[in-house]
């Protein structure tokens, strides 16, 4: 046990933190560049939201204007490559407004990104985080490979409540990855298998063709089966119980014809019975060959330059709070950071929100009861007034 603890301590001590932002005070505005790409971007403000533990620790930057694009980014202290290393991108998101449509993701870019002109088309290495619009609730993990943005093929569902949630992306040097939500694994796999970064290893043989005599019919008509002689019956017949109305005039109404009814003896279209096809060979499978266009890449995970992170978002309803950003080469360091920030907030925040929700529910219930009582009292008053008027009229 002591050895394991020592290893954990050594891992954290030797870890490199490339970027950390906790938005503890107003100085964040000096570090985060407001894009000038357009002049009507939405504004971020410093806020811990409605429910928090320690305000200075739990505050982050919050979107503050509805139906706005947001574009703000920050540089790292130095440019670095993650070749041969693990890379961890981690931050918290709280959709306090009960978001209906809007992004909550980050874009992590090269060091040469122009933050003053940061916008939706600015190249990035990785885009990661939750995105919600209507019923769609997904975690984006988009990797840029050779100039093209590639979406993960697996579905990862994000959280959509009004509490703070921790999102973690881990890129490993063996071309594997893991996405965590609130410290729990949400998806793992291979970069090559879960993204279309490389051409397929195998393709259908263009020279292969299904043989002309290949029979894929598992069952065929029984050639010896014959239709019974009494099979053919009309689908509809005249109703034998129908009688011509007594007032029917053939000259005026035309010749009377009984209505048609379904024929109980009708058997439908005859089809011969099916038997096993003795020539059946199964479903023909197109043979595959090695794809000459495929070349393995052991460095799908690796980018030569990392140097900036930004929020490039659209939100219909504002109120999302971002906080506790860390980019490091150590999973242990990211976990330690979460323990000092997210873990200390989540329980208190949930308890306070549940208490507030219960108080709101009780207040609404009391208001409803009061409205019903007032309605009933008014009804009684109206009835008394009506009775008095009727008594006055009798006098």
From Swiss-Prot:
InterPro entries listed in its UniProt record: Calret/calnex (IPR001580), Calret/calnex_CS (IPR018124), Calreticulin (IPR009169), Calreticulin/calnexin_P_dom_sf (IPR009033), ConA-like_dom_sf (IPR013320)
Record region (3 X approximate repeats): 254-292
Region ranges (C-domain): 302-395
Protein keywords: Calcium, Chaperone, Disulfide bond, Endoplasmic reticulum, Lectin, Metal-binding, Repeat, Signal, Zinc
Annotated spans, Disordered: 202-255, 340-395
PTM summary: Cleaved by caspase ced-3 in vitro.
Molecular function in Gene Ontology: calcium ion binding; carbohydrate binding; unfolded protein binding
Keyword Cytoplasm (UniProt): no
Function: Molecular calcium-binding chaperone promoting folding, oligomeric assembly and quality control in the endoplasmic reticulum (ER) via the calreticulin/calnexin cycle. This lectin may interact transiently with almost all of the monoglucosylated glycoproteins that are synthesized in the ER. Probably by controlling the folding of extracellular matrix protein unc-52/Perlecan, may play a role in the formation of fibrous organelles, a hemidesmosome-like structure attaching muscles to the epidermis. Protects dopaminergic neurons against oxidative stress-induced neurodegeneration.
Protein name: Calreticulin
UniProt source species: Caenorhabditis elegans
